[in-house]
Amino acid sequence: MSVDMKLNRAQFDAVMVPNYAPAAVIPVRGEGSRVWDQEGNEFIDFAGGIAVNCLGHCHPALVNALKTQGEKLWHLSNVMTNEPALELATKLVNSTFAERVYFANSGAEANEAALKLARRYALEKHGVEKDEIIAFDKAFHGRTFFTVSVGGQAAYSDGFGPKPQSITHLPFNDVAALEAAVSDKTCAIMLEPLQGEGGIIDADPAFLKAVRELANKHNALVIFDEVQTGVGRTGELYAYMGTDIVPDILTTAKALGGGFPIAAMLTTTEIAEHLKVGTHGSTYGGNPLACAIGNAVLDVVNTPEVLNGVKHREQLLRDGLNKINEKYHVFSEVRGKGLLLGAVLNEQYQGRSRDFLVASVAEGLMSLMAGANVVRFAPSLVIPEADIAEGLARFERAVASIAAA
């Protein structure tokens, strides 16, 4: 390979599998909430790598953890345990409802583990007939065949042949539908406390109460997918902490590594004991390099200063978006929680969320979609107020360009 090979967007099409359609911009450097591309153009990051970069880019604490552990020990496999993994598991246990932790590398893997555990728990405790998983329309739980089938979006799961069975999808926040569906055959109810890919839709308190009560009544487990909402994103360490219920199993990834691949499944001792030696595993899960960074992330995020700061920054971002909307009238509402917000396009602009992303990039702002009708924002939890203000100014210019077209 030539050392002077030009690495550009065209090269992606030449060498990569075409399952992504990345922008023409290729970032090469990031610091805090700002990113620079190959041409030196600067962007403010309101996307956060899809709610991953919870401390922005190249946070000093994470860089230090990476360098320090990188000079000690990289990988072992689970033939042996390691100190960073034990430390991180202990922090997660001490900070949540959980008593046991399983490490993986991605949200999909953590969710796969959660679903397998729920099935095995039900099989061993109640028999083979108790295998139904109840999930919800517009949910997203990952891209493995099991998780994508449990996620309630046919666009992601169709086209791969026969799907895993005994999965029931219901409308999100529909208590009556839930009451009609849950039975003694239900082994688990899986949901996001705030649907991300589905459009930034918060779970109603009454709905969550029904989920917990029906699960208890029918000896089913409640699985919270907190891959996107976890590690401070909503202003709580985990979103369930801002609700009146506690799940039986929780999955976490994305922000847990602040940009380094790591995930975990959290549960109780009584449930965890059903994953005996050899029933599940991951070669990289609990990798000391990943866990060292995860420890650094929790040390920074799990503090009153950062978690309270998320709620303050939410208000700044929400107020700014509403102020833009007062002028241009493009959104029907701004919804979400903490620093996971969605600006819902009104009837005139339905289906055009990608247009807003493209216009934002042209103005030097990175944002996200949550479906065709929602512009999603998931910036760093510690984004400076000046960057929020400048990002909003750039977004307003993007909105103005679309409104004037």
Curated annotation (Swiss-Prot):
<comment type="pathway">
    <text>Amino-acid biosynthesis; L-arginine biosynthesis; N(2)-acetyl-L-ornithine from L-glutamate: step 4/4.</text>
</comment>
<dbReference type="GO" id="GO:0003992">
    <property type="term" value="F:N2-acetyl-L-ornithine:2-oxoglutarate 5-aminotransferase activity"/>
</dbReference>
<comment type="subunit">
    <text>Homodimer.</text>
</comment>
<feature type="binding site">
    <location>
        <position position="282"/>
    </location>
    <ligand>
        <name>N(2)-acetyl-L-ornithine</name>
    </ligand>
</feature>
<dbReference type="GO" id="GO:0042802">
    <property type="term" value="F:identical protein binding"/>
</dbReference>
<feature type="binding site">
    <location>
        <position position="140"/>
    </location>
    <ligand>
        <name>pyridoxal 5'-phosphate</name>
    </ligand>
</feature>
<dbReference type="InterPro" id="IPR049704">
    <property type="entry name" value="Aminotrans_3_PPA_site"/>
</dbReference>
<dbReference type="InterPro" id="IPR050103">
    <property type="entry name" value="Class-III_PLP-dep_AT"/>
</dbReference>
<feature type="binding site">
    <location>
        <position position="283"/>
    </location>
    <ligand>
        <name>pyridoxal 5'-phosphate</name>
    </ligand>
</feature>
<feature type="binding site">
    <location>
        <position position="143"/>
    </location>
    <ligand>
        <name>N(2)-acetyl-L-ornithine</name>
    </ligand>
</feature>
<dbReference type="InterPro" id="IPR017652">
    <property type="entry name" value="Ac/SucOrn_transaminase_bac"/>
</dbReference>
<protein>
    <recommendedName>
        <fullName>Acetylornithine aminotransferase</fullName>
        <ecNumber>2.6.1.11</ecNumber>
    </recommendedName>
</protein>
<dbReference type="InterPro" id="IPR015421">
    <property type="entry name" value="PyrdxlP-dep_Trfase_major"/>
</dbReference>
<keyword id="KW-0963">Cytoplasm</keyword>
<dbReference type="GO" id="GO:0030170">
    <property type="term" value="F:pyridoxal phosphate binding"/>
</dbReference>
<comment type="similarity">
    <text>Belongs to the class-III pyridoxal-phosphate-dependent aminotransferase family. ArgD subfamily.</text>
</comment>
<keyword id="KW-0028">Amino-acid biosynthesis</keyword>
<dbReference type="GO" id="GO:0006526">
    <property type="term" value="P:L-arginine biosynthetic process"/>
</dbReference>
<dbReference type="InterPro" id="IPR004636">
    <property type="entry name" value="AcOrn/SuccOrn_fam"/>
</dbReference>
<dbReference type="InterPro" id="IPR015424">
    <property type="entry name" value="PyrdxlP-dep_Trfase"/>
</dbReference>
<keyword id="KW-0663">Pyridoxal phosphate</keyword>
<feature type="binding site">
    <location>
        <begin position="225"/>
        <end position="228"/>
    </location>
    <ligand>
        <name>pyridoxal 5'-phosphate</name>
    </ligand>
</feature>
<dbReference type="InterPro" id="IPR005814">
    <property type="entry name" value="Aminotrans_3"/>
</dbReference>
<keyword id="KW-0055">Arginine biosynthesis</keyword>
<feature type="binding site">
    <location>
        <begin position="107"/>
        <end position="108"/>
    </location>
    <ligand>
        <name>pyridoxal 5'-phosphate</name>
    </ligand>
</feature>
<keyword id="KW-0032">Aminotransferase</keyword>
<dbReference type="Pfam" id="PF00202">
    <property type="entry name" value="Aminotran_3"/>
</dbReference>
<keyword id="KW-0808">Transferase</keyword>
<feature type="modified residue" description="N6-(pyridoxal phosphate)lysine">
    <location>
        <position position="254"/>
    </location>
</feature>
<dbReference type="GO" id="GO:0005737">
    <property type="term" value="C:cytoplasm"/>
</dbReference>
<dbReference type="InterPro" id="IPR015422">
    <property type="entry name" value="PyrdxlP-dep_Trfase_small"/>
</dbReference>
